[in-house]
Amino acid sequence: MEAYKQWVWRNREYVQSFGSFANGLTWLLPEKFSASEIGPEAVTAFLGIFSTINEHIIENAPTPRGHVGSSGNDPSLSYPLLIAILKDLETVVEVAAEHFYGDKKWNYIILTEAMKAVIRLALFRNSGYKMLLQGGETPNEEKDSNQSESQNRAGNSGRNLGPHGLGNQNHHNPWNLEGRAMSALSSFGQNARTTTSSTPGWSRRIQHQQAVIEPPMIKERRRTMSELLTEKGVNGALFAIGEVLYITRPLIYVLFIRKYGVRSWIPWAISLSVDTLGMGLLANSKWWGEKSKQVHFSGPEKDELRRRKLIWALYLMRDPFFTKYTRQKLESSQKKLELIPLIGFLTEKIVELLEGAQSRYTYISGS
C-alpha cells in the first residue's frame, strides 16, 4: 500500500487527469440508464471509488516538513472519505435493488440515505458544529476568528518562552528567515553547553532542527453545542437547526416517496419546504439580533450557501414536476432544433441524458 501511495504522490497530475477522463466516459457507456443493467453502474462506481481514494491519498501527501497533509490524525477527517464512497455506491444500490426487488428499492435507498445522514451529523458534531462543505466531502478547516486570535496569542506566548523560560530575552520569530537563523545559532550554542547530556549529539541536532523548521502545531479545540448556544444564543440555535435540516432533508424526501409514491406532489413539496426553511434559518442566523451574536460565515461557507441555492434547480428534474412541465419543454426544444446539423444531434443526446438521469433517484436527489 505504501508503494502505491508513493506512486500516486509522484504522479498526482496524471492520476487526477485520468480519473476525470474515465468518469466522463462512463456517461457514454451502453445501457447506462437501463433498469436491468447493473454492469455500467458498477463500472462507474468502481472508477468513482478509485478516484476518491486517490484524491484522499493526494490530499494527505507529506509536506516538505514531513507533516501529513491537512488531514493530520483527526479521526473526523475519515468521514468525508466515507461520504464520498457512499455517494459512489448509492446508484449501484438503487439499480441492483430495482432489478431484484422492484418497488421495494426504496427501502435500500432509505438505508443509504440514513447512513449518509448519520455520518454527516457525526461530522457536524466532531467538526465543532461548522457548516458542511459539499455535503461533508470537503473538510471545513476555516477557523473562527475568535478561536484564531486566542490560538495566536497562545502560540506567541509559547514561542517567547526560550530554553530559560521567562528569563529568555531573545524573542526570535521562527516564522521568518532571520528568526530561524538566530534560533539556529541559539540552538547551536545550547548544544555546545550540553555535550555531557545523555542524549546523543546527532539526536539533539535533529530535535533542534525540527524545532526551528516546524512551527508549533496548536491543536484547535472543537466547539461544543452548549458553547455555540452560549456564544451565539438564538442565532446559534438557528444555525444548528438549519444545518440539521439540510443534512436530513434527503432522508425525509425519500421516506415520503416510499409512503406516497414518486409521482405524488407531497414528497416534492415537503422536500422544497425543508430546503426553504433550512436556508431561511441559516440566513437569519447571519442577520438577526446583535452583531456580536450573529453567525459570521467564511468565504468557503458563503460559496457553499450559493451552491445549495443552485442545486435547487434539481426540483425541475424531480417528478411530478418533470413529467408535467420539464419534459414537455425539453421535447419542444428538441423538435425545434432537430433539423439543424450537429446542433440537433447534440440536443437529442443532451435530452436523452437528462431523461435518463431523471429516472434515477440518486442522480437528482441533491444529497
From Swiss-Prot:
Expressed in roots, siliques, seeds, cotyledons, leaves and flowers. Low expression in leaves and roots. It comes from the Eukaryota. Signal peptide: none annotated. Its main location: membrane. The detection of an additional immunorelated polypeptide of 52 kDa suggests a post-translational modification of PEX16. GO terms for biological process: fatty acid biosynthetic process; peroxisome organization. Keywords: Endoplasmic reticulum, Membrane, Peroxisome, Peroxisome biogenesis, Transmembrane, Transmembrane helix. The chain crosses the membrane at residues 237-257, 264-284. Residues 147-159 have a biased composition (Polar residues). It is a multi-pass membrane protein. It is found in: Peroxisome membrane; Endoplasmic reticulum membrane. InterPro entries: Pex16. Residues 135-173 are annotated as: Disordered. Pfam families: Pex16 (PF08610). One of its GO terms (cellular component) is endoplasmic reticulum membrane. Coiled coil: none annotated. Disruption phenotype: Not viable shrunken seeds. Starch accumulation in mature embryos, cotyledon and hypocotyl cells. Developmental delay during early embryo morphogenesis. The internal domain (235-279) containing two internal membrane helices and the intervening residues that include the basic cluster VRS is sufficient for targeting recombinant proteins to endoplasmic reticulum and then to peroxisomes. Involved in the formation of peroxisomes, lipid bodies and protein bodies. Interacts with APEM9 (via both N- and C-terminus). Belongs to the peroxin-16 family. This is Peroxisome biogenesis protein 16. It comes from Arabidopsis thaliana (Mouse-ear cress). The gene is PEX16.
